[in-house]
Amino acid sequence: MFVYDVVNALDYEKARSIITAFISQYVQRAGSRGVVVGISGGVDSTVAAALAVEALGRQRVLGLLMPSLYTPPEDLKDALDVINALGVEWKRVDITPIYDAFVKTLPDFSQENRVAAGNILPRIRMTVLYYYANKYNLLVMGTGDRSELLLGYFTKYGDGGVDFLPIGSLFKLQVRELAARLGFADIAKKPSSPRLWQGHTAEGELGASYEVIDQVLYAVFDLKKPPEEVRGFFGEVVDIVITRVKKNIHKLTPPAYPDITPARRNV
């Protein structure tokens, strides 16, 4: 039972049509042959890849499996099931040797700061994706959703380093609903996890379930409800969410630079 019904706030067929048209037009305008996308076996990459196939055809979508030392076997199985269901070309790049070689070059590397250590993995994946994008004249299609974008729950210049985000307007719960409608009901039920360290789950790190987080985001940012009203239903989670949004807004803006207009000479 939802206080703020974020799941039913969307016309899914219309959203699907808008997103597939967007993918097709964006790729065409870029003069690209298609897209390359990391497929993890999670709900976001599954939905993004499925919509890309619908928009472009399976021949123009390249899927990359990029497991690390923290990737469980069930994720690989799910990713392969998605690839087989969609019929796309794919490649597997095990990034563990790259990660091991990288951290060995850092004189003071430590696992103590697991965020700093964990963020190396998505940045390696970004580099691999852009290698194949450059090689085959493809665009890197990101898989971030609106919940992650608002929260800043992604790695800067990692999974945030992409050319476009087709599901960036959908909340996590809406992505799950769309996944079920696209025929991926089992994946829609999987707990979300970036797999940046052993036992890592998104909801464990965020401190609340997406069932709660998405209602807070939807109420505050779409319905424009005052935080004190939303706090009456969800308590301190509202403050946690709003604080995270404010703290991570820099992830959604270009790098800052000074305005030197006063120093320019009129010549």
Curated annotation (Swiss-Prot):
Residue positions binding deamido-NAD(+): R123, K156, D163, H250, K251
UniProt pathway annotation: Cofactor biosynthesis; NAD(+) biosynthesis; NAD(+) from deamido-NAD(+) (ammonia route): step 1/1
Residues annotated as binding ATP: G38, I39, S40, G41, G42, V43, D44, S45, T143, K172, S193
Record's catalysed reaction(s): deamido-NAD(+) + NH4(+) + ATP = AMP + diphosphate + NAD(+) + H(+)
Assigned keywords, A-Z: ATP-binding, Ligase, Magnesium, Metal-binding, NAD, Nucleotide-binding
Entry EC no(s): 6.3.1.5
Domain of life from the UniProt record: Archaea
Binding of Mg(2+), residues: D44, E148
GO cellular component, one term: cytoplasm
A GO BP entry: NAD biosynthetic process
GO molecular function: ATP binding; glutaminase activity; metal ion binding; NAD+ synthase (glutamine-hydrolyzing) activity; NAD+ synthase activity
UniProt record similarity statement: Belongs to the NAD synthetase family.
Quaternary structure, from the entry: Homodimer.
PANTHER family xrefs: GLUTAMINE-DEPENDENT NAD(+) SYNTHETASE, NH 3 /GLUTAMINE-DEPENDENT NAD + SYNTHETASE
Function recorded in the entry: Catalyzes the ATP-dependent amidation of deamido-NAD to form NAD. Uses ammonia as a nitrogen source.
Protein name: NH(3)-dependent NAD(+) synthetase
Phylogenetic placement of the source organism: Archaea, Thermoproteota, Thermoprotei, Thermoproteales, Thermoproteaceae
